[in-house]
Amino acid sequence: MKIACIGGGPAGLYFALLMKRANPEHDVTVIERNRPYDTFGWGVVFSDQTLGNLQAADPVTAGKILDAFNHWDDIEVNIRGHRIVSSGHGFCGIGRKHLLNILQARCEELGVKLVFETDVTNVEDHADADLVIASDGLNSRIRTRFESTYRPDIDTRDCRFVWLGTHKLFEAFTFAFEETEHGWMQAHAYRFDRETSTFIVEMPDRVWRAAGFETMSKEQAIAYCEKIFGRYLDGHSLMSNATHLRGSAQWIQFPRVVCESWVHYGGKDRRTPIVLMGDAAHTAHFSIGSG
């Protein structure tokens, strides 16, 4: 079976290695537009249940991921001077870059072909495959091209959020709510390696505008967030790794994506299934632990 995965994020890479592991005779290729070690974002989170699923699907990959994970059982909520802790939840964090590198290495070990720095502008060029996986992300070109088949419903939600990082190490899945003169602002933080935590700042759009984030530079916005959430940072600074974004562009409104169908049949005879996967098919909000 010839399989082409368009997009080398976690979904495309993991599907590729599982298919190759299931049958070494499969001809599996992953095509990614970025370089091997280019990635954006900070850490991602998996629940204990998800880790169990990974262990069942491919113990080798799961073992490498588990070695790199930072595990916690507590969720901590901070609001109006109160600290509330709930235990027994079981989550793990890992750096997105590290996760991708583990998946890339496992793909190569199994014989999956990895093609980088290649931008697929016409998915029909790969319609000679028996199966095409459209794992090309949230802003999937393939989903857009065959919109009439997939019939996506994209709902852009109200709140604005920004992905930041810090060297303050949080020992629990931490939610911090701060009531400001402009309204409520929230931080969502978790550790994902020995040195770094993800720190997401979120607020309603009206609060974001009232606080002036719309006209702030990236540096000004970070300084403002450090001031609001300083009590949780213990003197540590906040960091951005979105060097490709400027000013208010680093603030995102969550797009809830669902599709009526995940399969389009392409190629000359319309027999090649082009299947949406990952964020191209559906999105998951970071608050449920899918970083």
Walk through the language-model features, giving the residues of each.
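Hydrophobic "anchor" residues on beta-strands that sit immediately upstream
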Residues: 3, 28, 113, 130-132, ...
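Conserved FAD-binding catalytic core of PHBH/FMO-like flavoproteins
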Residues: 128-254, 258, 263-266
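Short strand-connecting beta-turns/loops that link adjacent beta-strands
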Residues: 24, 82, 108, 169, ...
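Short, glycine/acidic-enriched loop or turn micro-motifs at the edges of active sites
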Residues: 35, 139, 282
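Conserved mid-domain beta->alpha element of the FAD-binding
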Residues: 5-21, 133-134, 250-291
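Glycine-rich FAD cofactor-binding loop and adjacent beta-loop-alpha segment at the N-terminus
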Residues: 1-72, 78-80, 88-98, 290
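Conserved N-terminal helical subregion
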Residues: 48-163
